[in-house]
Swiss-Prot record:
PANTHER family: 10 KDA HEAT SHOCK PROTEIN, 20 KDA CHAPERONIN, CHLOROPLASTIC. It comes from Ehrlichia chaffeensis (strain ATCC CRL-10679 / Arkansas). This is Co-chaperonin GroES. The lineage of its organism: Bacteria, Pseudomonadati, Pseudomonadota, Alphaproteobacteria, Rickettsiales. Keywords: Chaperone, Cytoplasm. Its main location: cytoplasm. Pfam families: Cpn10. GO terms for cellular component: cytoplasm. InterPro entries: Chaperonin_GroES, Chaperonin_GroES_sf, GroES-like_sf. One of its GO terms (molecular function) is protein folding chaperone. The keyword Phosphoprotein does not apply. Together with the chaperonin GroEL, plays an essential role in assisting protein folding. The GroEL-GroES system forms a nano-cage that allows encapsulation of the non-native substrate proteins and provides a physical environment optimized to promote and accelerate protein folding. GroES binds to the apical surface of the GroEL ring, thereby capping the opening of the GroEL channel.
């Protein structure tokens, strides 16, 4: 991965749920967005009022859960990712 995240940004590869057994096909705009993903890149963190960096609690390889409408989708090397702030992540697998 040749993409360096800045500040407290996290790059996530969404883990899709496969529910193809239903005969009803919904348009993409009506489908529920994924809320689980694998972290592929993290920024260094943000600076506090004293000028010290607050390190990230999320690391590359973590499987995380995030808010449904969190982040922005980007495409990098023909693959889709979600970029979000660390604060949009609500849990990680232990």
């Amino acid at each position: 991965m040749n993409l360096n995240m800045l500040h407290d940004n996290v790059l996530i590869e969404a883990l899709e749920e496969c529910n193809s057994s239903s005969p009803i096909q919904l348009p993409d705009s009506a489908k529920k967005k994924p809320t689980q993903g694998k972290v592929v890149a993290v920024g260094p963190g943000v600076y506090n009022h004293s000028g010290n960096i607050l390190p990230m609690t999320i690391k590359v390889g973590d499987v995380v859960f995030y808010r449904q409408w969190a982040g922005n989708e980007i495409e990098f090397h023909d693959k889709k990712y979600i970029v979000m702030k660390e604060s949009d992540i609500i849990a990680k697998e232990a």
